[in-house]
Amino acid sequence: MRKAFLFLPVFLSAVAPAFGQTKAPQPSTTAKVPSVVPIKEIVDKGTVSGRKYTNDKLNFSLTLPAAWEIKPNNFADDMLRQGVDIRLKAPDNLRPGDQAKVNQSLRRVEVLLTASRARFDSYQNAILRVSAEDLKPNPQIKDAVDYFDAVRASYKSMKLPADFVYSDTKAEKLGRHEFAYLDIDSAAGKKRMYATVQNGFAVLFTLTYSSDDDLQSLRTILSDGNFKLK
């Protein structure tokens, strides 16, 4: 069963709606499995200067266009105060034992950057979340293709929602760097997940979108990014 939860951090980011759209939990006197992973930084979060994000520890930088708004690091806390919970945590519909396994796996994940692109012709925004997952417990993962192949294997081992459809692992060269990616369709919307492996971490760029223009914008962001910082 351990392998089924090996890459659930990616599963959670794929299944969750754009902003989580989960109401903040109400106080309860019933003992529950802790649902939120305690904050513990596993890798440097990087820095933001204007519209440029840089992570020296993971050797990459990227610049977001003016149409994108970079959210502050306390964005999840701000959303929680508004009644929307987007924190990394196990889904409520899992059994307590499975929730504990998922939350344990989430200890290897760090959200590095969250950004959104508002569309004036639609009520739907595009949401970009950049995250990193520590691969030290899984030395067999050598590159992003290996990573997404493992993700797909864990998908196959679980009972997913009927509307959850995911693609084969694919690769795309954007600029000077090659990424693996998955496409996902579900009730939560369309997602494109790009990944690369940097210094022992899987770095994920997860886009929730409705317009192909937003997807093209992400492709341009990655094409123009520098993934060989020294």
Predicted regions and their residues:
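Acyl/amide activation-and-transfer machinery of modular secondary-metabolite enzymes
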Residues: 123-130
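N-terminal targeting sequences that direct proteins away from the cytosol to non-cytosolic compartments
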Residues: 18-116, 120-122, 136, 158-179, ...
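Sec-dependent N-terminal signal peptides
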Residues: 1-20
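Long, charged/polar, surface-exposed segments that mediate recognition or autoinhibition
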Residues: 130-161, 222
